[in-house]
UniProtKB/Swiss-Prot annotation:
This is FMN-dependent NADH:quinone oxidoreductase 1. Its cofactor is FMN. Belongs to the azoreductase type 1 family. The lineage of its organism: Bacteria, Bacillati, Bacillota, Bacilli, Lactobacillales. InterPro entries: Flavodoxin_fold, Flavoprotein-like_sf, FMN-dep_NADH:Q_OxRdtase_AzoR1, NADH:quinone_OxRdtase_FMN_depd. SUPFAM superfamilies: Flavoproteins. One of its GO terms (molecular function) is oxidoreductase activity, acting on NAD(P)H, quinone or similar compound as acceptor. Quinone reductase that provides resistance to thiol-specific stress caused by electrophilic quinones. Homodimer. Signal peptide: none annotated. HAMAP family: Azoreductase_type1 (MF_01216). Keywords: Flavoprotein, FMN, NAD, Oxidoreductase. FMN binds at residues 17-19, 144-147.
Amino acid sequence: MTTLLIILAHPHTDDFSWSLATVEEFKKSYQESHPLDKIIIRDLFSEKVPALDNETFAAWKRNKYAPDTLSAEDKNLLHRHEEYLEEFLSADKYVFVNPMYNGFVTAELKQYIDVIAVPRKLFRYTENGPIGLLEGKKSLHIQSAGGFYHNEQDPTHMANDLGAAYIDQTMKMVGLTDENRQQLFVEGYARYPERADELKEKAFTSAENFGKAF
């Protein structure tokens, strides 16, 4: 059975969310086109992904040198790390969903990638650089932004989107080929509110098409 892992890295508010609405259109289309596939949704804002902080590094050290001294809190923390990693490894396709925050992804998504990007699991180091271990898998990055950052008529703004480049480069590092790393940008709705309906329809149509082919 093919497994699709959707990673939601978006806060839940009463306001309309362009990225969350777009991924819902994608999911609906995907389910219709892949009825036998398993879909897992990780909501990072609700789950509070563990950070790589002092507690984490201390738990790692105790686990390596003195595992008998691990506390219940240590064991729970390490278990959560392992759970995120194993789930990511077991999936065949990934969808990352986030708004652009100050030219980057949300802190929750960055923390999640820090947790799952484990050497010798997702990639290995060689004298010629890292080699990815997730060959054959696919990713789709859905990102919303109020302005335009990926306008073919004005590509200069792409340099301001560090988040999309980060996700793409990370997936490349772990072994996903160029054709298996895809992006869907939902943009311009704040800059041109009078075009909101047009931009929404464009985003939803793209999401539907991605859902059919992904």
